[in-house]
């Protein structure tokens, strides 16, 4: 919220830019595909760039929401849950806004480190296999998927 307010104070009126940006996004290739394609495609692209360890971490995060609300978790774990969980909510809001159609593997890169915090929630015995899965996934995507980056 602080960065948004800072930009507003500096003169950037996002509420004026949003409708124009929305219109520009829906020109071109985005107009060819239905919104549901982008809704699920964006999340799939994010899943590919984050890798399986993050998926596991987010799964653990989802199971710890109730203990978080009851303050039954240690402070470090609570901080990880809050940061990674907040970023997952930001991703959901960004996806629901329909403002990103394709290229989320580039546009959503700032979300990835925050989501990656969720890997700290994995049980210790899962961390080495999760790291191996991340490396294999990264190499497979880099070598088998054609991207323009």
Language model segments and positions:
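A C-terminal functional module that forms or caps the active site or interfaces directly
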Residues: 75, 85-95, 101, 112
């Amino acid at each position: 919220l602080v960065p948004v307010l800072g930009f507003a104070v500096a003169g950037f009126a996002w509420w004026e830019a949003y409708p124009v940006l929305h219109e520009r996004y829906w020109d071109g290739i985005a107009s060819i595909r239905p919104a549901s394609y982008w809704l699920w495609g964006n999340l799939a692209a994010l899943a590919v760039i984050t890798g399986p360890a993050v998926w596991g971490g987010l799964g653990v995060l989802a199971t710890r929401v109730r203990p978080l609300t009851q303050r039954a978790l240690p402070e470090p774990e609570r901080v990880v849950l809050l940061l990674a969980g907040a970023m997952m909510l930001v991703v959901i809001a960004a996806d629901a806004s329909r403002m990103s159609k394709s290229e989320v593997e580039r546009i959503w890169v700032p979300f990835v480190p925050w989501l990656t915090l969720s890997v700290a929630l994995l049980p210790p015995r899962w961390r080495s296999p999760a790291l191996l899965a991340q490396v294999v996934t990264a190499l497979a995507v880099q070598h088998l998927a054609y991207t323009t980056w």
